[in-house]
Design a protein with these regions (language model features):
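Donor-sugar nucleotide-binding helix/loop cap in glycosyltransferases
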Residues: 1-185, 193-200, 205-209, 213
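Short secondary-structure junctions and interdomain/linker hinges
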Residues: 183-187, 227-230
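Short, conserved, surface-exposed binding loops centered on an aromatic residue
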Residues: 190
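Long, low-complexity, charge-rich intrinsically disordered regions
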Residues: 203, 217-298
Length: 298
């Protein structure tokens, strides 16, 4: 095996799935991986070596030519991908990838942070280990965590945070009102905008609570229906700035193209509002902050 590299290689999650699948049915040389993935020799080597570091592949063969085979860990990895069990895929990476584990741990220990803040924390945390991070490394591992749903990234501020709630808490409405007030204050006295962007509120509240965007939408709709006359949803023109995000929302799903188990990845640049009775709403207005929230009805 080649001498261990300190930083994570720039390999996408879909490539890790592909190379593990390619080597599943028998050992493969670098040239065979190169042909199967339709990539350059350099890219094939990067992918193989990172998959080997994570224990998805093992090196075999002699000094003349190394070949690679999928390990038991790799088999479990593929089984979880086929089942679209993304939490289990995340668990496997957290166990076997030192960079993935370190990324998650710094968010668990120190809370959310943008790229620069995480880089500073990780440099300190990894000082006495064989591993290190640079900006590219954080973007690579951050991409893995986002696509697996373990981490979300505020699409406006770029802050990473753990998605560690399975449902919104009973104080959802208080956190929403706090975020609403904060945005109202930063909008400026002259603007006096009663209607605030739902996509921006969603990103802020999800970061504060560590909840999923889908759970936010469900809770917001329930809250509005439970407090008619106090909260109001409003639509917006198609070119509304309320829908424009600085960053996309990354997702993953399994696909079977040409018999190869891989992942399709989409980055949603335009963020959706919330939908009620087949209509999209992009703004929220608060007329009375004396509201209640029944989680059982959400």
């Amino acid at each position: 095996m080649t001498e261990e590299r300190a930083t994570v290689r720039p390999v996408t999650l879909s490539r890790l799935v592909e190379v593990t699948h390619v080597c599943e049915e028998g050992t493969k040389s670098t040239d065979e991986v190169k042909a199967a993935l339709d990539v350059s020799h350099r890219r094939a080597r990067e992918t193989i070596l990172e998959a080997e570091r994570i224990s998805l592949l093992s090196e075999r063969g002699n000094e003349e030519e190394s070949v690679y085979a999928t390990t038991d860990v790799g088999e479990s990895f593929l089984e979880s991908v086929r089942a679209e069990d993304w939490p289990q895929v995340s668990s496997i990476l957290a166990t076997h990838s030192p960079h993935y584990k370190a990324f998650i741990e710094t968010l668990e220990n120190d809370g959310q942070g943008d790229l620069d803040a995480l880089l500073e924390r990780l440099e300190v945390a990894q000082e006495f280990t064989p591993y290190s991070f640079n900006q590219t490394g954080i973007e690579v591992v951050g991409d893995w965590t986002e696509r697996l749903g373990r981490v979300q990234r505020n699409a406006f501020s770029g802050s990473y945070y753990l998605k560690d709630r399975s449902e919104v808490p009973p104080n959802f409405h208080f956190v929403l009102l706090e975020a609403y007030d904060d945005f109202e204050q930063t909008a400026g006295v002259d603007l006096r905008q009663r209607y605030l962007s739902i996509p921006r509120l969603r990103e802020e509240v999800c970061e504060r609570l560590g909840c999923s965007r889908e759970d936010f939408d469900d809770a917001l709709l329930a809250l509005c229906q439970q407090n008619v006359g106090k909260l109001e949803l409003s639509g917006a023109p198609l070119d509304s700035a309320a829908k424009d995000a600085a960053l996309g929302i990354k997702k993953m799903e399994r696909s079977n193209e040409g018999g190869l188990v891989t992942t399709s990845q989409s980055t949603q640049q335009v963020m959706s509002g919330v939908e009620l009775y087949d209509k999209q709403y992009y703004y929220l207005a608060v007329y009375d902050s004396d509201i209640t929230f029944n989680t059982e009805a959400s």
